[in-house]
């Protein structure tokens, strides 16, 4: 119970500072998810087991920051590609209950953990699916999310076929991204002109734990 309260207090302080409009029940669910993620991580490798920051900051708040740069809307269809332990999809589904999230990963054990957490938390706007990206056919989305370490050009190659016109790919990435962005833009002729533009935003100011971290938005 003490751990839950500590997670809740840390998250409330960060989110309220950024004027994120979350209800008490949403804070409760986000803190509960952080604890579930840690519990599941002891059984399955979902996140690093040598964390240098609290999970609620490094993973939950980190995911929520996407919504500051891309306000999710009611009815928006979002694909979380390579979700792992439900990141960023589960925190975002809690914070934006009218947006629909499909969480996909090629590792069955990780998806089983996501399905169990979604069920325990009572989240109705998120579905976890065991699938490879190549097997997703006939589906289109307004937005694709990724926390994968894959190069941006590779992520664009994976996702352009799923994006609706005016859709975007949002990535949480780290390091010097100039060359990675230039490579993705140079290769857009191979991906039906995607991305048309790429914006990137440093997020180190939100927390010392996000040094050299950025949010990248590639527009269809």
Curated annotation (Swiss-Prot):
InterPro entries xref list: rRNA_ssu_MeTfrase_G (IPR003682), SAM-dependent_MTases_sf (IPR029063)
E.C. number(s) listed in UniProt: 2.1.1.-
Pfam families in UniProt: GidB
SUPFAM superfamilies, sorted: S-adenosyl-L-methionine-dependent methyltransferases (SSF53335)
GO cellular component: cytosol
Keyword hit for S-adenosyl-L-methionine: yes
Coiled coil: none
Keywords: Cytoplasm, Methyltransferase, rRNA processing, S-adenosyl-L-methionine, Transferase
Top EC category: transferase
Gene Ontology MF: a single term: rRNA (guanine-N7-)-methyltransferase activity
Compartment list: Cytoplasm
Residues involved in S-adenosyl-L-methionine binding: 82, 87, 105-107, 133-134, 147
Family to which the UniProt record says this protein belongs: Belongs to the methyltransferase superfamily. RNA methyltransferase RsmG family.
Functional summary from the UniProt entry: Specifically methylates the N7 position of a guanine in 16S rRNA.
HAMAP family (UniProt xref): 16SrRNA_methyltr_G (MF_00074)
Name used for this protein in its record: Ribosomal RNA small subunit methyltransferase G
Designated gene of the protein: rsmG
């Amino acid at each position: 119970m003490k751990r839950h309260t500590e997670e809740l207090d840390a998250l409330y302080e960060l989110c309220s500072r950024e004027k994120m409009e979350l209800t008490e029940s949403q804070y409760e669910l986000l803190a509960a998810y952080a604890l579930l993620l840690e519990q599941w991580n002891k059984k399955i490798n979902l996140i690093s087991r040598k964390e240098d920051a609290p999970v609620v900051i490094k993973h939950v708040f980190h995911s929520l920051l996407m919504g500051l740069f891309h306000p999710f809307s009611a009815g928006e269809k979002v694909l979380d590609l390579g979700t792992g332990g439900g990141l960023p999809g589960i925190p975002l589904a809690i914070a934006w209950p009218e947006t629909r999230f499909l969480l996909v990963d090629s590792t069955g054990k990780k998806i089983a953990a996501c399905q169990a957490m979604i069920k325990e938390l009572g989240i109705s706007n998120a579905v976890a699916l065991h699938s490879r990206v190549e097997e997703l056919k006939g589906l289109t989305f307004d937005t694709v999310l990724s926390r994968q370490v894959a190069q941006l050009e590779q992520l664009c190659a994976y996702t352009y076929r799923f994006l609706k016109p005016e859709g975007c790919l949002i990535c949480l990435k780290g390091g010097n991204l100039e060359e990675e962005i230039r490579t993705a833009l140079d290769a857009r002729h191979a991906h039906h002109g995607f991305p048309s533009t790429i914006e990137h935003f440093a997020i180190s100011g939100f927390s010392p734990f996000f040094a050299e971290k950025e949010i990248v938005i590639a527009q269809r």
